[in-house]
Regions:
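Short amphipathic alpha-helical segments
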Residues: 11-15, 65, 69-73
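Non-catalytic substrate-recognition/targeting regions of SAM-dependent transferases
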Residues: 41-51, 70-141
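Rossmann-like S-adenosyl-L-methionine
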Residues: 110-226
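A short, charged
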Residues: 21-29, 82-103, 154-178, 188
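A short interface-forming secondary-structure element
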Residues: 56-67
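Non-catalytic accessory regions of SAM-dependent methyltransferases
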Residues: 1-54, 202
């Protein structure tokens, strides 16, 4: 649902209103250096997700109706951000979820506009990450886990920590930066582990935070035996 008004025209002015409302809300509630700027139904733009990672936008479109408007919405968002002095250097589309096929759409992955370096560094909760918006999972990083990652910091000082399904190491790194004695992160994805190790180096944590590429369900019984 985009509006509750039956006579509301879905035009450029309407889309600009929705985008401005979404951005103004983020400015009041979250750290906007990296955040989910557009969150589908929550912003009355159903089926559309736009994540901002520093100066990069990542777009995920999951419904046919909004798919036809996505590039116009992206252009509006870039213009709105520029009013706050924010220049977007690139936009990448990650509309590669299977659910698109339910509405007869192909799975799409690629640049919207000019090509650019798809790796971007962000900082969250005092932890530095290199996000790969092209090859990472989903839109590149799980922004929705920000406060769960922060909560980990309060629990991990002087602890030994095992982070299963670590992806790019975000929970492991939050444990490490909070003073954990030793942290092991495990994931079956070689790419994810490679990125996690790079993130550990970015934060100077490679001596206390290690990453293992393995199937968690195979590894846990072995660890239990040790």
């Amino acid at each position: 649902m985009m509006t509750r008004k039956q006579d509301q025209e879905i035009d450029h002015a309407f889309l600009e209103m929705r985008v401005r409302d979404a951005w103004e809300y983020r400015k009041k509630t979250v750290d906007t250096s990296s955040c989910r700027v557009i969150f589908g139904e929550a912003d009355f733009l159903p089926g559309l997700v736009i994540d901002k990672f520093s100066d990069v936008l990542v777009v995920e479109s999951l419904a046919l109706g909004i798919d036809r408007m996505k590039e116009e919405i992206v252009d509006i968002l870039k213009a709105v951000l520029s009013e706050d002095g924010i220049t977007i250097r690139g936009v990448y589309e990650r509309s590669d979820a299977k659910v698109r096929q339910n509405e007869g759409m192909e799975r799409v992955k690629g640049f919207i506009g000019e090509e650019f370096d798809t790796k971007v560094e962000i900082v969250e909760n005092g932890v530095r990450y290199m996000v790969d918006v092209k090859d990472g999972q989903k839109t590149g990083f799980f922004l929705d886990q920000k406060y769960n990652r922060l909560a980990i910091q309060r629990l991990c000082k002087d602890a030994e920590v095992l982070d299963c399904f670590t992806h790019t190491g975000s929970f492991a790194l939050n444990a490490g930066i909070a003073g954990a004695k030793h942290v092991t992160g495990v994931d079956a994805s070689e790419l994810g582990i490679e990125q996690a190790r790079e993130n550990a180096r970015l934060n100077g944590l490679e001596d206390r935070v290690e990453f293992v590429c393995a199937d968690v369900f195979d590894l846990l019984p072995k660890l239990e035996e040790e």
